[in-house]
Every structure is written in C-alpha cells, then in structure tokens.
Amino acid sequence: MKFSENWLRNHAPIQANRDVLVATLTAIGLEVENVAVLGEALDLILVARIVNVVPHPESDLLQICQVDVAQDTLLQIVCGASNVRPGLVVPLALLGAKIGALTIKSTTLRGIESNGMLCSAKELGLDTEASGLMELPEDAPIGTPLADYLALPDASIEIKLTPNRADCFSVRGIAFDVAAACASEVTPFHIDEIPAVSARTLPVELHAGANAPRYCGCVIEGIDPAAPTPVWMAERLRRSGIRPVSLLVDITQYVMLELGQPMHAFDVDTLRGPIGVRLSRNDEALKLLDGRTVVLDNDFLVVTDADQPIALAGLIGGWETRITDTTINVFLEAAHFAPAAIMGRGRKLGLHTDASHRFERGVDPALPPQAIAFATRLILELAGGKPGSLIHVQLPEYLPAPASILLRRTRIARLLGIVIDDAEVERILQALGMQVTTQAEGWRVVAPSRRFDIAIEEDLIEELVRIRGYEHLPTALPVGASHIAMPSETRLDMTSVRRQLIARELQETINYAFIDAELLRRWQLNTGQVMLMNPLSAELAVMRPRLLPGLVAALGRNIARQLERVRLFELGNVFTASDEAGAAPLETRHVAAAVCGDAFALQWGEQVRKVDFYDLKGDLESLAAASGAVLTFHSSAQPWGHPGRSADVWCDDMCIGWIGQLHPALTQTLEINVDVIAFELALEPLVRRALPRAHALSRFPFVRRDLACVVPEHVTWSELAITVRDVIGPLLRDVKLFDRYVGKGIEPGFKSLAIGLILQDDTRTLIDRDVDDIMTKVVMAIQQRHDVRIRS
C-alpha cells in the first residue's frame, strides 16, 4: 500500500515528524518498505506560462521560449523538450535555483542567452518515468511557488501489509492506527446527504446470496466529459502509485484509496436494466476493459445488465459499458463482495487489480453507501451533473455482524504481565474506532465493521499492546532451575534421520505444505483433500496429502536445470480429511525420497549404471536399521507406481508406505523424461525402537548353507524370507538373496533364486546333522507354501 504523507496527516492530525511517523508505522505492524521524499528543495521554482516559441537559429533540437512568471518582463529560456509549445504552463527554475547538484545560472546556448530552466517532473524528483516538460493545468496561478501549488514537500510512503490488515488498504484505515499510536484521533469524516435532482434510476437484483449481500449505486446525468482531474487529486493519486487517467476513473480510484471501497463507473446510456449480481454460467463470454474476451466457467461472480454479464464483480469492468471521453451520464457502483467469491478468480484469467486485491482480503461491508455519497459529491463539484437518488439493495441476513467482546482487566494483566490504566485502555480502543462500554469486570467492546481480524478477547489485548508499544512489556528471565531432557533411547530423533539420509548422498528439500490440486489429480490423489479457505494462490490451494508430488516436482525442476543425477529427500507433515464432521484434519509426519540418474557419482573406480529400485531400497533399509525396524515388502497396486517395480512397505503388520519406480505415464505428464525411483513412509513406525540391549558374541562357529531354487514368478523374495525365518527361528542369524536368474534352462513363468543362510547357536557348535535337519525343514516349507523346486 502506497500513500501520500500529507494525505495521511489530513486524516490523522499528529505532530510527529516524518522520521517518527515512519518508525511509528513499523512499530505498530505496518512495516514501511520505502519512503520517497518529494519536493524538499524547490526554492526559486515557480509556475510559469510559455508565451512564445521560435526555433533556435543554430540548432534543430532547441527552441527559444519567452516565459511569463508574473514579473515585469518575460524571461528568455532555451529549451530542448519535445513538448514545448506556446500556452503551456510549466515549472520554471529561476537563476540560483538548485536542481539536484545543478545550480541554475545564466548561460549561452549556441549564441542565445538563457536565463533559467524549464523543468520535467523527473528533474524535480516528482516522478521516475516522466519525459518532457511537466505540464501543469492551464488555470495554475502564474508566479506561484511550485511547492505551494503542489502541496509540497511531501513523501510517498509504501508499507507492507499482513493479510489480516485489509482495513489498512486505505489512507483512512491507516490513520486510525497512527492516530491511536500518537495519542490523537482521526479527523471526523461525514458526507451530507445529497438530494436527488434526476429521477433516473436502475432496478437492482441480487441473486448471489452471501457472495454479494449489499449493492449501492447512483445515476448522475449531464456531467462535463471534458472536466479535468484537479491537480490536488492527480498528485495524491501519483504519490499513491496510480497514474491519473480521466476525471471519472480518477474519482473512483481516489475514493478507493481514501476510504478503502473499490468502485466502478458504467456509462448509463449503455445499460438497459435491471442491474443484477449472480454467479456466471458455463461458457459465458465477456469482453473486458483490457480488450480481452474471456470465456467463464460457473465459478465467477458477475454484474449483469438485463441478465447479460457486463463486469466481473470485484475484478474488472466490461468493454461495452466502459466510460469514454464522451460519457455524460454515469452509473456509479459500490458493493460488498465476499472474499471467497473473488479469491483466486483473477489468477484464473491472469488478472490482478487493485479492486481484487482488496476484495480478496475483505472490505468493510458498511462502506458502499458512504463511498457512493463521497464519489457523487466529488463528481458534482468537479464535473457538474444532476444526481439521482441513492440505490441501496441488501440482504441483511448475509451481512457480517461486528463482534461484541467482553474485555476483562484481569485477562489483560494475566496475558501482558502489566496493569494498563482504564483511561488508557479506553483511549486506545476508541481511537481505533471501537465502541467501548464500561462494565464491572472490564469493558464491552464492539469492533468496527472494517476490522475482520478482531473476534476474541485476545485480539483486543493484542491491539492494546501493539498500539501502546511492545517495549512497555516487562522483561523477566526464566525463574527456576532449567531441566535438560535427555534424548529418549526408544526413539530415533529427526536429526539422526536427516544425518542417515544425508550420509546416503540424499539432499534435503523443504517444500510448501500446500500443493496444486491439478498436480494431485495427475497422481490420482484428488480424494479426501483438505482445501484452504484463503490460499496464497490457486496453485497452492490444497494441503498436501503426501510428500511425493511436491518432492518429485522439485526433482523435475532440478532436471530442467540440466542436473542429471538428483537425489532428494524431505521430512514433513501431510494432511488428510477427518472422517468426523467438523473435526480438524489428520496430520501425520512422513519421510520421502526421490532419485534419478546414475547410481554413483562419476568416478573411474565405479561402473556406470542407472539407479534402480534396489539402490533406494538399500537406502530405506539403512534408515530402518538405525531404529531396528523390520520392514517387509509386498507387491503394490498404487496407481502412480510402475507395475512390477514397486512395493508397499509393511512394518509390524501395518502398511506404512510405498517404494518403487514411478509409472511412466505419470512421469510423462510431469514432463520428466527419466526413470524416477521414490519412496514415502509414515515416519512414526520408523523412529520407534526397542530399548537397545547388548548381546554377547557367540563363542561357537556359524555355518553357511546355500539353496538354489526355482520359484514361480509371482512369489516375491520377501515371502520366501519370511517363511525361512518362521521355520528356523533364533538359530537363523541372516538370510540373503545373492543371485537371481531368468533365461535358458528356466521355464517361462519361473525364476531361479540363490539364497544364503547363516546359522549359529549361542550354546553349542552346530553339527552337520543339526544343519541338515534344519535345511530339510526349510525345503519342505518353501515347497509346500510356494511351489518351489530345489535345483541340484
């Protein structure tokens, strides 16, 4: 939000100088990002009129001007500006004036004496982009100091607003906070009722319920289309970052900046009536003010004329009903549109307007009648005309009601640790525009309709300390002995998880907890979504149900930047909708990884090959080994996984995640042209671990036996391993798959697996007969359960 310092002081009559004002704004939460000082050194610069212009005899680029500054004689000025012409009113720097580092002196240019300098706005520090001489209105008083005429010096102040302070998107909204912080009060603002002169009106129909509960308007006939924007208004707009366009448009912008209510003006002669507000219909088309024709879906709020769209409510007007240079009859609109009805619609069309910026965050629902009256008064004063009566249509049941809150003295003292005098509490709250009624235990406070962010007692206490100053809160060191908790040995902490994954050459990624609904649709994760009511953007409108979509998107961006070997992991929360109506979403911590490219960094001692399922499975198993979690892997049917190259991950008889190669169809839609291997698991089962116990090493030798078996293709290695462990029990120290073969000598539908078993007893040496008995049991079990044949 950018505004003029002088404009703010008109609403908040404070004595503080500019430096104190800037510091105060930041201290009360309205962070100042930039201050552009305007017109501090305009001595000896006057308003002048060019009386005569003749070409310079020695230069095609210079003109000789005779200039009137209300002195006895005309001044001769040599000028090279492209827009110099007789009758033009411009700023003139007299001899001795300073413009930046330049002091104006009498000089001779190509043999012609010049006794001053005609100035551009850029040279005077009043604009950053202007070219040519600064053109002033024809009625500007000649000989008047420019600083007096333009109400200078001034400053253009730009502040950064948090989303909850939509009320400060107006000069008057900011003034309430500044006045309260500086022990002052805002200047009263009242517009007298304007009597109707014209009988012309338009019927209004509201068909959008809570999306548009209030609509105000006024018809004004017979305005002067050639009336210029007065310099005081044009300068306030410029210093607020808005370029003047035409009087009617400038008045709507001016009212928006001063009061905070976006407005729109229609050429009433292009309207038939009735005016309506409704949701758009699929495939409705509308030509916008920027010249584009857009096709709408059924999710836009539109203003209609005879049920035909003429504007996108809260966004932008339509081409057919626009104000032109010949408009003499106008219909002013000021309405209250709900933030949810405007939010994200502009981004769908690539639009961002001052109106949508305000409506998305919330506009005072009580403002429309006041804004119409103010704009009507300005038009009558500056362009004449005959006003009609105020049109005011509303749906009271949908209008938000101001919060009425009990503020207790005891609660203030408990939260802040200090006692604030009753008089100070009442002064601050009343200066902020709140209605305050004294009660036995404190005050009954009604928040102003512009303050959507005030709903509970703590909000009021925050206002007190914000305006009074956080520096007045007591500073106290913690009392009592500090307690340093030892890390639990039954849990693997997050630092250890990160270190383990980093040791496996994975790099940590931190993504938003929000994600694009369209991306989830591609992953077939578009059920049970947790939608945000006020998203940062349309692309970040859903709380992520899994880490992988965002993580793989980050991997894709790295690939697009010519990185071939990418290894990423992320630790974060995921969100799913609760089965209970009205309950908070379920929040679970997950760990995920995604890799692509070569298995190893390029070096002479390693064979070059692509990373595969088993590489990432090894990374996952190393993480599980750190906590002692026992993982098993079963074939998966997840839609984003490659069939045959992905698995569900189980721990303690519960499916906790997925690992595998992404489905080629998915990577193609994500515009990733390499194989991506990934996993994602719930973190809680991985970080739980039993209390570590020490075991003595066996004094007796181990025995290794190998089995070569032919196994049906559908039988997985994990199923075989589980059977072997069940049969052997505690004597089995390890079981490994060390070879897999498919091809000549193995019939179709089968595979050959070579298994190594390590057997050991802690109490005695295993003899051949013991081992043979065990191996016989293993062979019988796998033959019966899995239709396995032993190879000789």
From Swiss-Prot:
For this protein, what is the EC number?
6.1.1.20
Cellular component terms (Gene Ontology)? phenylalanine-tRNA ligase complex
Output the Gene3D superfamilies linked to this UniProt entry. 3.30.56.10, Bira Bifunctional Protein, Domain 2, Ferrodoxin-fold anticodon-binding domain, Nucleic acid-binding proteins, Phenylalanyl-trna Synthetase, Chain B, domain 3
InterPro entries the UniProt entry points to: aa-tRNA-synth_II/BPL/LPL, B3/B4_tRNA-bd, DNA-bd_dom_put_sf, Fdx_antiC-bd, Fdx_antiC-bd_sf, NA-bd_OB-fold, Phe-tRNA-ligase_IIc_bsu, Phe-tRNA-ligase_IIc_bsu_bact
Residue ranges annotated for the FDX-ACB domain, each copy included: 698-791
Q: Which reaction does it catalyse?
A: tRNA(Phe) + L-phenylalanine + ATP = L-phenylalanyl-tRNA(Phe) + AMP + diphosphate + H(+)
Q: Which residues cross the membrane?
A: none
This protein's name: Phenylalanine--tRNA ligase beta subunit
| Gene assigned in the entry | pheT
